[in-house]
């Protein structure tokens, strides 16, 4: 690294530290479980996206081992050259069945799935209407297109309609929203958005990263939760790294959509395909949720209990509707201090501040899973009570 570049990088790092934005990730010293190990201590884990408890499940590990032994360590190529194997087709067929759509296409990253699908769908002359709290992958994906980009106030259907009225086009009108919003835990009002899209001849695009495996029958997602899963004008994109405990993303919808993405989605075209072990584990997760749908109900039982008890303690959880349960602290230093104190009490829950969330809205984001026991949640709640009183957040 040249001296000038080194100085530039150091200057930027110092700025991040001054502004309280510097990140130093915690290192987990045990598997991704509801109880794990951080900094040498056993902790209740409220920081992961392991919604259904699949990350270290014996069945998924066995499926991964089987596919590793049968198919080897890697795929060796991009999908369009020599990197599409029968196990990739098997996974896509399983995802389409699960989502209730004509087809599904697996992409190599959840983040770049949005870039790939949006880039393939949109061109100059199209207009996009995007919720202001959409995920960074949507924001970055839209920046790479030539479509006109308009932002509507969060979950504000009246504002969305104003924009639809004012911006007609002969091209595609695409309404883009998260299914479940990752910082607040609220659900997109698809029951209002989809009818509005029909009225103005628009297509709806849902990033269901935090809804898949959580909402709907057997965790089939936000779109299924609202009953729009067979609508050809609703495009679903989701990740394979959260509830399904793997890596990657996928798009589900009409067969023609899959064919278009195979030909035009750049992350699909230029990234090596999933290795066999990952696909084996993902297939195992989809098999398990069919056999054990009670996991989703257990997730919701735990979620309801944890939210109710936090409210009883006097915490503001920002009206969250899902297992994503933010606890509001306001200023980032306070949230980070609370996170540090919780860790001392044996609870791993991470503070989040600006720019991930607005200034004055710093919080600790908790995610309850199906694998947590009541005893684990009670330990976390006791820690929250102790820390909250120490910091003067609750009485």
Swiss-Prot record:
GO terms for biological process: biotin biosynthetic process. Gene3D superfamilies: Aspartate Aminotransferase, domain 1, Type I PLP-dependent aspartate aminotransferase-like (Major domain). It catalyses: 6-carboxyhexanoyl-[ACP] + L-alanine + H(+) = (8S)-8-amino-7-oxononanoate + holo-[ACP] + CO2; glycine + acetyl-CoA = (2S)-2-amino-3-oxobutanoate + CoA. GO terms for molecular function: 8-amino-7-oxononanoate synthase activity; glycine C-acetyltransferase activity; pyridoxal phosphate binding. Substrate binds at residues 135, 356. Catalyzes the decarboxylative condensation of pimeloyl-[acyl-carrier protein] and L-alanine to produce 8-amino-7-oxononanoate (AON), [acyl-carrier protein], and carbon dioxide. Can also use pimeloyl-CoA instead of pimeloyl-ACP as substrate. It also converts 2-amino-3-ketobutyrate and CoA to glycine and acetyl-CoA. Activity is also observed with the following combinations of substrates: acetyl-CoA and either L-alanine or L-serine, pimeloyl-CoA and either glycine or L-serine, and palmitoyl-CoA with L-alanine. Homodimer. Belongs to the class-II pyridoxal-phosphate-dependent aminotransferase family. This is 8-amino-7-oxononanoate synthase/2-amino-3-ketobutyrate coenzyme A ligase. It comes from Thermus thermophilus (strain ATCC 27634 / DSM 579 / HB8).
